[in-house]
């Protein structure tokens, strides 16, 4: 059973609707933060860990519009944008000696297919709309959510497919990493493994 009033928390009181719970709450500012807040912690883990990213130097955002009919924009201020592009810039890190630009796209927006990746290869995981492209001077690394199915593409060279641990085991998934980090306590080795700690 769900205690609806408790679930609403500090948000304005409203009647229960299946259009909000159990899934779509993510797209409303009173309850969630849109696709970026919902999925970035799973998708951006790979570049954050691989490149040693910390806080950004600056962020720029552009959002898509929704039209109900010709030239009539549907603006819903309580709802997160239907699509967005967020450009996040970082200074060089201990793992990368040049500045890094990270571009987040959601709502069906996708980057151009890099030349180094064969046209029939998925960007990220097979049959998934989510993924990561890390584009460097010598090649491209692609992976899916949670860093799964990583591949290294280098122009004119054979694709390298990396093995990743099976994360279907309950002892080794993002839920348990988060719980173990909390149990071990702030500043512990387990806590430091969490790429998005709640230190703010």
Where are these regions (language model features)?
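Glycine-rich, aromatic-lined ligand/substrate-binding cores of catalytic
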Residues: 3-189, 193, 197-198
């Amino acid at each position: 059973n769900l205690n609806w009033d408790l679930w609403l928390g500090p948000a304005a009181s409203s009647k229960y609707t299946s259009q909000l719970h159990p899934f779509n709450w993510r797209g409303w500012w009173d309850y969630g933060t849109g696709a970026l807040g919902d999925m970035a912690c799973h998708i951006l883990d790979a570049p954050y860990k691989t490149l040693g990213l910390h806080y950004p130097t600056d962020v720029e955002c552009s959002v898509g519009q929704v039209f109900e009919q010709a030239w009539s924009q549907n603006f819903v201020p309580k709802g997160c944008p239907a699509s967005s592009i967020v450009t996040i810039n970082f200074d060089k890190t201990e793992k990368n000696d040049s500045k890094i630009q990270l571009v987040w796209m959601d709502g069906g927006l996708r980057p151009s297919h890099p030349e180094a990746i064969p046209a029939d290869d998925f960007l990220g995981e097979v049959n998934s709309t989510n993924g990561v492209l890390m584009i460097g001077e010598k090649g491209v690394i692609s992976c899916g959510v949670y860093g799964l199915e990583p591949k290294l593409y280098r122009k004119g060279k054979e694709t390298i497919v990396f093995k990743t641990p099976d994360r279907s085991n309950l002892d080794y998934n993002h839920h348990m990493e988060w719980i173990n980090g909390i149990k071990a306590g702030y500043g512990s080795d387990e806590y430091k493994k969490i790429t998005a700690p709640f230190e703010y």
